[in-house]
Amino acid sequence: LTDNEFNVEEELNLNSKVLHWVVPTKGAYETHRQINNLNEGMSHFDMMHFLKNKWLGWGKTKELVHVTYNGMTFDEELFRRQFYWNLIDPYLTTNVNGSSRVDLMVIMFLIANFFSDKVKIPTDDEGNLRYKLEMVAEANGISSLNAHDAVVDSYLMINLVRLINEKIPQLWKSAVSTATKKDFIVAINKEPFSMFAEIVKGQAFNYPVYPCAQNSKKPNEVLLVDLYFDPKELFEMSYSELKGQIGKSGAFKKIAINKTCLLYTSPSPRDTR
């Protein structure tokens, strides 16, 4: 837990015994380099309820922003399953006391496209962007010793966020101000356009986009139109032709607003005011 200046107020380092039905693997223990949970520690049930109570306690006096790295596909799903298994609200990180979340890896995609002169994104020998947490940290002078340990990775993220807030304050402000679905929808409809950024096969790409539809049956799905495409040509297309434009190389991009989105909502990405 940190304050608004990213000073650590409290640290958690929790372990539980391996679940009875889990078969430990050599590769997993080589990654996190700890074996004490084979025979020691609290039960998995007790650990998850301790974490729940701790997060709820923090949220009584603060509107929490849960920051992860690649959390949309790993951490979030992991926590939801663990909470659900132990009879806890699986959406604890997003639905309690104004809590929200930011996936820092997505922020790196935006940095690679618009702010690579401020924060470094490393490349390999072939010039492909590499954005693993420890690689980005090292490229910016942050030691990644003992990376993949949960506490160490948390400090890597804190130091990276502190750096981003120092070098690109408008980007971090944009990420936090659009960290909830409601605020995100307001932001992308208010600005003249937003910038969609991604990294594909090690290369950075970006597009000016604007929302054009929201799925009435699945309101978390929003359709964006790529403003690089000529709207006159789109208006002349048939329904089937328009449907064929939805996808990676088409005029329409589908996003999920219940996840950190690859969008920068500032009117001018390089505006440093």
Please report, for each region that a protein language model flagged, where it lies by residue.
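Acidic catalytic cores of enzymes that act on phosphate-bearing nucleotides/polynucleotides
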Residues: T178-G247
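Glycine-rich, highly charged phosphate/nucleotide-binding loops
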Residues: M42-L51
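Metal-dependent phosphoesterase core characteristic of DEDDh/y 3'-5' exonuclease domains
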Residues: T2-H32, W58-P169, A175-T178
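Glycine-rich phosphate-binding "P-loop"
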Residues: I35-M42
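Single conserved hydrophobic/aromatic residue that forms the stacking wall/gate
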Residues: Y264-T272
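Residue-level signal for short segments within beta-strands and strand-turn junctions
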Residues: L1-N4, D226-Y228
